[in-house]
């Protein structure tokens, strides 16, 4: 289980004369058990990405903790084979001077250190699993469409056989039709690989399509946590505002 407990994070102001800290994430707590698919929904600037970095162990909270099976997530040996990640900006998350083969091999070497012949077969299988042929093995990221690049990023994330994958606005830069294809792929992988997801997004429609639990995030705090099936019954003012902006029931 991933457990986020009373997490807080602030950053130093860059202003020369006002060296105070600005709180970004404020006392956030929630749990993501095995088998869960949880969306964290919030508008731009709400602190979602800061929270995602703490969940991934990239940053440590100023206060509180993030644990995986009661062990601190910021320790690499805890998270190394347990959680994968897919980000919005595939152009920076995929090394521009590596082929798809090299991108996948790099992760495989860190995890298993298999012979190249074995890794070649595994990489082709991974690509097929995300809907790409082995012809993509020798392509560079700049030769891929946005949807293809995100499929490679997903292949890299599942390469370590994780129990969890965190998606940080992973489909927001894609066309609507491609978004649906990627969401369908994530549903398929969740079922076949028994994955758990933390899906960070501003898009309620995508969140309700994929996830069974929704966390509504506003100004660094959890405004509401609600099952997807009960979203249309929410009486929270901010949740209703987001629904009215994005959905019609």
From Swiss-Prot:
> Which SMART domains does the protein's record reference?
AAA
Q: Which UniProt keywords apply?
A: ATP-binding, Cell membrane, Cobalt, Cobalt transport, Copper, Copper transport, Ion transport, Iron, Iron transport, Membrane, Nickel, Nickel transport, Nucleotide-binding, Translocase, Transport, Zinc, Zinc transport
Q: What is its main location?
A: membrane
Subunit (UniProt): The complex is composed of two ATP-binding proteins (CntD and CntF), two transmembrane proteins (CntB and CntC) and a solute-binding protein (CntA).
Q: What is its EC number?
A: 7.2.2.-
**Gene3D superfamilies linked to this entry:** P-loop containing nucleotide triphosphate hydrolases (3.40.50.300)
Name the UniProt record assigns to this protein:
Metal-staphylopine import system ATP-binding protein CntF
Which cysteines are cross-linked by disulfides? none
By its UniProt entry, which PANTHER family does this protein fall under? D,D-DIPEPTIDE TRANSPORT ATP-BINDING PROTEIN DDPF-RELATED, TRANSPORT ATP-BINDING PROTEIN
Phenotype of gene-disrupted mutants: Deletion of the cntABCDF genes decreases StP intracellular levels and decreases the import of iron, zinc, nickel and cobalt.
Tell me the residue numbers annotated for binding ATP.
42-49
Specify the ABC transporter domain's residue ranges.
2-244
Subcellular localization is given as: Cell membrane
Q: Which SUPFAM superfamilies match?
A: P-loop containing nucleoside triphosphate hydrolases
Give me the Gene Ontology terms describing cellular component. plasma membrane
Q: Name one GO molecular function term.
A: ATP hydrolysis activity
Q: What's the stated role of this polypeptide?
A: Part of the ABC transporter complex CntABCDF (Opp1) involved in the uptake of metal in complex with the metallophore staphylopine (StP). May be involved in the import of a large array of divalent metals ions such as nickel, cobalt, zinc, copper and iron. Probably responsible for energy coupling to the transport system.
What GO terms describe the biological role, i.e. biological process, of this protein?
Answer: cobalt ion transport; copper ion transport; iron ion transport; nickel cation transport; zinc ion transport
Q: How does it sit in the membrane?
A: Peripheral membrane protein
What does the record say about induction?
Up-regulated in metal-poor media.
- Which residue ranges run through the membrane? none
- Family from the record: Belongs to the ABC transporter superfamily.
A single Pfam family it belongs to is ABC_tran
> Which InterPro entries does the record match to this protein?
AAA+_ATPase (IPR003593), ABC_transp_ATP-bind (IPR050319), ABC_transporter-like_ATP-bd (IPR003439), ABC_transporter-like_CS (IPR017871), P-loop_NTPase (IPR027417)
């Amino acid at each position: 289980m991933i457990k986020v407990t009373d997490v807080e994070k602030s950053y130093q102001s860059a202003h020369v004369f006002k060296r105070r800290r600005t709180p970004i994430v404020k006392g956030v707590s929630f749990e993501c058990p095995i088998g869960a698919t949880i969306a964290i929904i919030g508008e731009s600037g709400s602190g979602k990405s800061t929270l995602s970095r703490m969940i991934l162990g990239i940053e440590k909270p100023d206060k509180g903790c993030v644990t995986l099976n009661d062990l601190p997530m910021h320790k690499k040996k805890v998270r190394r084979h347990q959680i994968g990640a897919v980000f919005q900006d595939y152009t920076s998350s995929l090394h521009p001077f590596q082929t798809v083969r090299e991108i996948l091999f790099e992760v495989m070497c860190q995890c298993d250190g298999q012979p190249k012949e074995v890794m070649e077969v595994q990489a082709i299988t991974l690509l097929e699993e995300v809907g790409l042929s082995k012809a993509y093995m020798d392509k560079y990221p700049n030769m891929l469409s946005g949807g293809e690049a995100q499929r490679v990023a997903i292949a890299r994330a599942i390469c370590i056989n994780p129990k969890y994958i965190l998606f940080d606005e992973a489909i927001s830069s894609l066309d609507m039709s491609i978004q649906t294809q990627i969401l369908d792929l994530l549903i398929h992988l969740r079922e076949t690989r028994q994955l758990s997801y933390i899906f960070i997004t501003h898009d309620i429609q995508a969140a309700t399509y994929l996830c069974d639990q929704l966390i509504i995030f506003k100004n660094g705090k959890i405004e509401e946590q609600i099952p997807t099936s009960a979203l249309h019954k929410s009486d929270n003012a901010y949740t209703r505002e987001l629904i009215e902006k994005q959905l019609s029931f």
